[in-house]
Design a protein with these regions (language model features):
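Soluble extracytoplasmic regions of secretory-pathway and membrane proteins
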Residues: 1-443
Length: 443
């Protein structure tokens, strides 16, 4: 059974630490620890995430997650920007214990630049502008420098010719944490191709980059060998690329259709779904991306991941979807799905609703929610009590030739910035229901 979960890694925020000094910043505070993991479709009795993995060191409520202490230290991450030295005369801070004490650890991997000579230390001290690298008696011949720990910077040092997706995601495999980065090749000089944003007219998500959060090891997997740009780079640098078939199945199960690419393709598809030249020329049958209310403000609907059974399929799969409206009209006319599982990875599938049927669009559903007396009264009551009501993303869930809409309602106290799920709104056609959970609202 497929389940979607959210993974939030715990990186070290060096800027917020107390008693900052060279020893503490460079030798002791070297890594983050573990991750909080929660399913996207359930909460606890207080409306907070129903954590599958929590605490430091990590503890799992599900045995199969197997988040271990040794495998989930985060030396390399999105927010980890400072260099550190490991295997020094100082033990590293690991995690807090009771009574103000701290657990300590030592780096066990043979990664980083070995500080085993005066000339190495002198060169690095000059490069880093840090004389302590040269003169500190806390560094020995086995000490190592971990440099370029930000995963964006680290990948760019290896493959500067790739453009990285701004939103890498963390996955857990056999107790360890890995970062998966979607990497792109692009040009604005591809013949007979329309431009996106006056900068790009050819874009491929040909490479998946995997970074081990503990060791910093990086693997680049070539997923689209038909991409002539990536293929050329792989011939120039044959040792840094691996084929997609070499990616372990445990990692490949987490590969997903990238949201940035899907967003760009969706925007182009608003016009280029039209195949009749005359209709295209006069601008008929063009579509638009609908709007929704999020945090009480109007915004364009963004693509979102769902686990669902696509029409015509027999099994659930992980997909990225986005609905479309006819231009200047509020109803939903079609939707696009980007597929992520198995042999269907990277495929797009478009669905168009029958023209004789009017399917309410997100804007219409938001209006129905606003007009419902019971919902409006409850939201006003919460607002008047000094709490902030947060209307979450409106999700359109296709079911056969119809759809249902789901919108979570969160409540956040002014003194405590911790949103709690308090209600779920479900809409089917013109029928609206708001209950404490999805199942009750649906039935």
């Amino acid at each position: 059974k497929l389940n979607s979960v959210m993974v939030a890694t715990r990186e070290l925020d060096i800027e917020s630490t107390a008693d900052r000094n060279w020893t503490r910043e460079r030798l002791q505070l070297t890594h983050g620890f573990g991750a909080a993991i929660a399913p996207v479709n359930s909460v606890d009795a207080d409306g907070l995430p129903n954590l599958l993995t929590s605490n430091i060191p990590p503890q799992s409520s599900e045995d199969e997650l197997n988040i271990t202490i040794d495998g989930s230290r985060i030396y390399f991450g999105e927010l980890t920007n400072h260099y550190v030295m490991v295997k020094t005369n100082e033990n590293e801070f690991d995690y807090p214990l009771d009574e103000g004490k701290n657990a300590q650890t030592r780096y066990e991997d043979d990664k980083g630049i070995k500080l085993d000579s005066f000339f190495k230390k002198a060169a690095l001290a000059w490069e880093l502008g840090d004389v302590n690298v040269l003169i500190s008696d806390q560094l020995g011949s086995d000490s190592r420098l971990l440099l370029y720990r930000n995963i964006f910077e680290r990948v760019n040092k290896i493959a500067p010719f790739l453009t990285l997706d701004p939103d890498p995601y963390a996955v857990t495999i056999d107790g360890s944490i890995y970062w998966i980065h979607d990497a792109y090749t692009y040009t604005n000089s591809f013949p007979y191709s329309s431009e996106y944003g006056q900068k790009v007219n050819y874009l491929r998500n040909s490479v998946k980059v995997v970074t081990d959060a503990q060791t910093g090891d990086i693997d680049l997997y070539l997923f689209d060998e038909s991409d002539f740009i990536a293929s050329t780079w792989s011939k120039i640098f044959p040792t840094i690329f691996k084929s997609a078939n070499e990616m372990p199945s445990s990692l490949k199960a987490h590969v997903r259709y990238p949201e940035m690419l899907f967003q760009m393709q969706s925007e182009m598809y608003l016009r280029y779904h039209v195949t009749d030249a005359d209709v295209f020329f006069v601008g008929e049958d063009f579509w638009s991306i609908p709007t929704e209310k999020f945090k009480q403000k109007e915004q364009l609907v963004e693509p979102y991941y769902v686990v669902m059974t696509l029409p015509g399929e027999s099994e659930e799969e992980f997909a990225l979807i986005l609905p479309f409206n006819p231009q200047n009209r509020p109803n939903t006319i079609a939707w696009l799905a980007g597929r992520s599982d198995g042999d269907n990875y990277g495929k797009l599938r478009a669905y168009r609703f029958p023209t004789e049927r009017q399917i309410n669009g997100p804007t219409q559903i938001e209006a129905l929610i606003d007009q419902d007396p019971a919902i409006s009264q409850q939201i006003t009551l919460w607002d008047s009590a000094g709490s902030e009501v947060i209307r979450g993303n409106l999700l359109m869930i296709p079911i056969g030739n119809s759809v249902i809409y789901v919108e979570p309602i969160y409540l956040q106290a002014s003194s405590r910035k911790l949103p709690q799920l308090v209600r779920v709104v479900v809409a089917n056609g013109n029928v609206i229901a708001m209950e404490e959970d999805f199942a009750t609202a649906l039935y």
